[in-house]
C-alpha cells in the first residue's frame, strides 16, 4: 500500500513550518509562535513519521531530539583542509601583515579587509548536498576530523535544509559551535542542582557537549553556531568578496556575527580591534580576538597559503587580561555550603574591562603555594566572567624588614581556627583542599542553603518552601534556623511578596505536617557533610534513636555499614558544635518527632553485596522508587560507574554513565530486567 498523497503533503508542510519558526526563533531572535504551538506541530509531525516511517527525511526537524547512542566517532576527511590562522599580538605585527599583503598584491593602495570577532569555541564543518545537511565534523587536525552529524542535527540554529537559492550541489560551511555566557551560567546552575561537575568555561562546555556519543545529551545542552566561511564548493559561488559570501550564508539561514564589517587599510584594522575590545565584556559570547581577511576572493586565491595557514588572513589576539596591584589584606569568605575561601583585598586596578578590588586565592594550600602575603605586589588575572584571581606574586617587590632583604615584613597567611561569621570551629580533612565551617545550621553564611536542604522533598518534605521563599524569610529576619520555621504564622507569611493568605495557610499546614517525620529524614535534613540519604537511613537503622547517635564516638559510628573515617569525622564534628546541638534541641521543642527504636524489618536480600547505578528516565519507576527497591533488597545504589559496579540500569536519555558502563564492560539492563533481579535475584 503506497503512501497517501495528502499525508506526504501534510508532513512536508509540518517540516516547512517548523523550520520557518526555528529560523525565526534561533537565528533572527524574533519568535513567530508560542512554544506550546511549536511543540504541538512538532508532536504531530513525530506521530506522522512514526505511523509512516517512509516519511522520515534527512532534513526532518524531528532529528533535533537526538538518536541512538554511538560507540565512537568515525573519522571524516574534509573536502578542503580546515587550516589554522597565524596570530598577531601587537600593532606592529598587524602592520607587518598588511605590508606582506600589499607586497604580495604589488600595490601601495590601502587594501579592503573583512573583519569579524574570533569566536572562542569549537570549529566545525557542515556538508550540504543539494541543500540538505548530510554530514558534520570537527576540525580535528585540519585534514581529518570526527564526524558528529547526529549531534549537530540537534542544534536548532543549524539549518537542516538551506533556505533561499544559489547553493551548489555540494558545499561545506565552516563555522564555530559555542555556548552563550547566559546559557553557560544556566547549564552550570543545573549541574550544581544535580550534584554534577560544573564546566570550567563556555568553550569547554561547548566542546564537551558536542562530543557526546549520545546525541540526546547534546540536544539538552544550549549550544549555538555561527558561520564564518566556505570550504568545498566556494568556487561555484557567484560572489566576489568575503563580505558578499557572508551575506549569502545569512540568506541561506545561518547565524553570522553582527559585528562583522569591511574596513580599509591597517588603520581600519587597528581601529576595529580597539572597538571590539571595548565591546567585548558586553558581548553575549566569549571571543579571544578578531580575524582579518582580505575581502576580495580573487586576491585571496592570488595570495594563497603558506605551510598550514592562509597568507590572506590573520588572527589578532587580545592580550592576557592581567595587571599588577598591591595586596591590602587577606580576608576569608564563607560560602553557602561552609567552604572557607581566602580572598585578597586589592588596591583597585582596572583589568578585563572592570575595576577589581578583590581576587580569589581559592584555598589555604594555594595561598601557601603562591606565598601571598599582606603588602605583596601580585599579578591579577580576569577573563570574561571568571572571578578575578591572584596568579602569582612579584618577589622583588615584597616589603622586607630591613634594607638587606633578609626577612619579609609580613608573616605567611594562616587560616583562622574559627568561622568569621559564626565563631564555629573550622576543620579541614587530611585529603581535602577546602576548609569548612562546622556551624552548618547556625552559621549566617550557610543559613539559606541549610534551610533549603532541610525543607527538601527527600528531607523534611515541606511543600511550598522553595529557595525564593527561603531568601525572603532570611532577608526579612523571620527565620534564623530550621527551628524558627515552626513558629511562622499565616499572618506573618501573608505579608511576603507573592504570598497570599491561601498560600500562607498551605505553607503553615505543610510545616505543621513535617513535625511527624522519620529519624532518617531528620538526619538527612540536618545537612551534615558527607551524609546522604542512604547513610542517614543506615544511621537511623543502626542506632534506632537520635540520642544514641548523638552519644556515639568515632569508633561506634564506624560500626555502621558504609560509614568510614571520613563520614565519622563529619558526624563527630557536626554534633560536637554546640550551635548545632542548640538547633536540634530547638527542633525537638518545636514538636519535631519520629518513631524511635523500631528499625525497619529487612526483606529478602536478593541483591546483597551488589552495586547498581541508575541513569536516564525509567518507563514506570521514579528514580527514588527504584533506589528504594534496590536498597530494600540489600543492594547499593552508587552515583557513578566504576569497575566495582555490577549493573547499570538505563532508561531514556541515559547520559555519560551509560557511556562509562559500555567503556568498562559493565552489564547494562533496563527496568524490566531490574524487576526480574528484584524478584529472583542474580542467577
Swiss-Prot record:
Ranges for domain BRCT: 602-683
Top EC group: ligase
Residues annotated as binding Zn(2+): 419, 422, 437, 443
Gene Ontology terms, MF aspect: DNA binding; DNA ligase (NAD+) activity; metal ion binding
Annotated EC: 6.5.1.2
Binding site for NAD(+): 35-39, 84-85, 116, 139, 176, 293, 317
Residues of the active site: 118
Keyword presence, Transferase: no
Reactions listed under catalytic activity: NAD(+) + (deoxyribonucleotide)n-3'-hydroxyl + 5'-phospho-(deoxyribonucleotide)m = (deoxyribonucleotide)n+m + AMP + beta-nicotinamide D-nucleotide
The keyword Glycoprotein is assigned to this record: no
Keywords: DNA damage, DNA repair, DNA replication, Ligase, Magnesium, Manganese, Metal-binding, NAD, Zinc
Coiled-coil intervals, chain numbering: none
Pfam annotation, one family: HHH_2
SUPFAM superfamilies documented for this protein: BRCT domain, DNA ligase/mRNA capping enzyme, catalytic domain, Nucleic acid-binding proteins, RuvA domain 2-like
GO process terms (BP): DNA repair; DNA replication
Cofactor(s) required, per the database record: Mg(2+); Mn(2+)
HAMAP family: DNA_ligase_A
Described purpose of this protein according to its UniProt entry: DNA ligase that catalyzes the formation of phosphodiester linkages between 5'-phosphoryl and 3'-hydroxyl groups in double-stranded DNA using NAD as a coenzyme and as the energy source for the reaction. It is essential for DNA replication and repair of damaged DNA.
Recorded family membership: Belongs to the NAD-dependent DNA ligase family. LigA subfamily.
Protein name according to UniProt: DNA ligase
Organism: Dechloromonas aromatica (strain RCB)
